[in-house]
Amino acid sequence: MIGLIGKKLGMMRVFLNDGTAIPVTAIKVEPNYVVYIKSSETDGYNAIQVGSIPLKQSRFKKPMVGHFKKANLTPLKYLKEFRVDDVSSFALGQELGVDIFSPGELVDIVGRSKGRGFTGTMKRWDFGGFPKSHGHRYHRAVGSVGNRTDPGRVWKSKRMAGRHGNETIRVQALVVVDVLKDKGIILVNGSVPGHKDGIVYIEKSHIAFRKKAQRKQDRLSFIPSNLLRQEV
């Protein structure tokens, strides 16, 4: 599924024709370029490598500089590979923009969640904790982590305290509310992983054929694009 590299700007709200307010996330998409093309004949599958946001050449090692020169591009900070059905419509150095998406389309977005540091089980796993009564001293403790003789150890994947957040998360079947081509901005319904100015990857949804996703798509009737342009 073809996709783009973007930057999360933040959240706002827009109004549907019936007056319902819906939350949307604004994603800024700088010009994306095709850096490398993989085909089923040479690599076993079809895919394109997309890059975005230029950086100084001195920040890259020579093999990477040569990698970009093959596509006649300056070195780019972010790279992402997207699977495609057919590579014949792409060329090295080709520029990709927000116009590959259209309002009402379903997309998947991948980003890194906000890092929370080392947290306990109540914040990390939403544990209920112990009673808040007087005389109790285990209010926010973990509690039991296993049996005694059998198995005599802590099971793998046991929910315990640890580093919270900063994980790669995919949010599926978000509806594209509007595409502002002149500003390079995509508005999607709902929240997107990560903090403001965080890098996200947008691609056409893998579950668009499911009935639940289709109902979500049909539920929204969007306001005219010219009204959205006044708010962004």
UniProtKB/Swiss-Prot annotation:
**Keywords of this entry:** Ribonucleoprotein, Ribosomal protein, RNA-binding, rRNA-binding
GO BP annotations of the record are: translation
Q: Name one GO cellular component term.
A: cytosolic large ribosomal subunit
Q: Which GO terms describe its molecular function?
A: rRNA binding; structural constituent of ribosome
* Superkingdom of origin: Bacteria
Q: Which Pfam families match?
A: Ribosomal_L3 (PF00297)
Q: Which residues form a coiled coil?
A: none
- Known partners and oligomeric status: Part of the 50S ribosomal subunit. Forms a cluster with proteins L14 and L19.
NCBIfam families attached here? L3_bact (TIGR03625)
* Stored HAMAP family: Ribosomal_uL3_B
Q: Which PANTHER family does its entry note?
A: 50S RIBOSOMAL PROTEIN L3, LARGE RIBOSOMAL SUBUNIT PROTEIN UL3C
Q: What does this protein do?
A: One of the primary rRNA binding proteins, it binds directly near the 3'-end of the 23S rRNA, where it nucleates assembly of the 50S subunit.
Q: Report the sequence similarity comment from the record.
A: Belongs to the universal ribosomal protein uL3 family.
Protein name (record): Large ribosomal subunit protein uL3
Native species: Hydrogenobaculum sp. (strain Y04AAS1)
- Its gene is rplC
